[in-house]
Amino acid sequence: MTRAPGPGRLFLTISLLGLGLAFGRPVNVSAQEPYVVPADQEVVLQRADRARVKGDSAAPIRIVEISDFECPYCRQFHLESARTIDSLYVQSGIARYLWISFPNSTHPRAWPAVEAAFCAGAAGRFWAMHDIMFERVDQWKSAVDPVSLFVQWAVEIGIEAQGYEYCLRNDVPAPLQVADYDSALRSGIASTPFFVVGDSLAIRGVVSIERFRSAIDSVLIARGLETP
């Protein structure tokens, strides 16, 4: 665990694109169609960007995860630690959580997998598809046509198929993905998973849940806040 490279620089995604509910202008979302991917690219980008942020906007600290759906260590974190972190810190209002994509060049299917999650995010279902990407990686990374699988899984979680498939096959969320990638590179990130806690403390790679909690708690204690 080290000091984070360039505090604040990891959030260039938002400043570059002007997107996001917490960091940019809000988007009007129809209550009648919560799981429909909109046709307008700007709206897709705005909704996808804000969907990958979870937790109370007034939370005292922020946790950023830089990740790759095809990375085995990222999957290990998801399976072993992510739900505990979410329960103790995010759902309790202690931390706001932001997921940033940083696919490795040796992972050819990682890019479309990120698109699958961001297109789902445009329909308000980012985290549901995020979980599926990690839990079914062995299926999609070897599929002849992973997009067809992604559409099938999107329907499983209540997303309308036509708009979702259009989003995928036309690379609609690509600007958000490129901004994520460039932002991580400029911040000196070279591998995944990589975490930044409280804009100050970096966690590189997979660590035990005990060490992860200790890192978060150290930031809270340094700010005079209670730990869970």
Where are these regions (language model features)?
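Bacterial N-terminal signal peptides
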Residues: 11-25
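C-terminal cap of thioredoxin/glutaredoxin-like
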Residues: 32, 66, 82, 151-228
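Residue-level recognition of alpha-helix termini/interfacial anchor residues
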Residues: 41, 125, 136, 171-173
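A short beta-strand-turn-helix
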Residues: 44-61, 89
